């Protein structure tokens, strides 16, 4: 039955705005995961960042956190301007299920140097 398939809450792109130097948390809600893997992909270069708890990027700032309510959250520590852009979480079903998060990075006003 379809009920045991993993599914994502909300197919629309989420938007997250984070200040430079702070931590970003990109949400991907997955329910009834079973034995399916959840991957986070950085769309600008197609780099697979995480699969479940495993991290596949040398950058120590990236971490996937599984929340008690079955959210898989991608944490990016000390966000930099180049982190801005689209990220996608994918569930390893056939066909795969995916949801996108758009990360916007802003500079806090008191850090401006004129």
Q: Which residues does each PLM region occupy?
A:
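N-terminal edge beta-strand
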Residues: 1-24, 114
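Solvent-exposed loop/turn motifs of extracellular immunoglobulin-like beta-sandwich domains
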Residues: 18-27, 33-35, 67-71, 77-89, ...
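Conserved strand-loop elements at the edges of beta-sheets that form or border functional pockets
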Residues: 10, 18-20, 32, 42, ...
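Extracellular/luminal immunoglobulin-like beta-sandwich modules
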Residues: 39, 45-46, 86-109
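N-terminal V-set
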Residues: 1-7, 31-63
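Extracytoplasmic beta-sandwich strand-turn segments characteristic of Greek-key/jelly-roll folds
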Residues: 11, 54-75
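Extended interaction regions within the primary functional domain
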Residues: 4, 50, 81, 106-110
């Amino acid at each position: 039955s379809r009920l045991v398939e993993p599914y994502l809450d909300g197919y629309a792109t989420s938007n997250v705005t984070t200040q430079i130097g702070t931590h970003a948390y990109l949400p991907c809600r997955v329910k009834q995961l079973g034995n399916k893997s959840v991957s986070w992909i950085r769309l600008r270069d197609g780099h697979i960042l995480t699969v479940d708890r495993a991290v596949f990027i040398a950058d120590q700032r990236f971490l996937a956190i599984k929340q008690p309510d079955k959210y898989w959250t991608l944490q990016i520590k000390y966000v930099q301007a180049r982190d801005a852009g689209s990220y996608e979480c994918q569930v390893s079903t056939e066909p795969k299920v995916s949801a996108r998060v758009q990360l916007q990075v802003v500079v806090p006003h008191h850090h401006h140097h004129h």
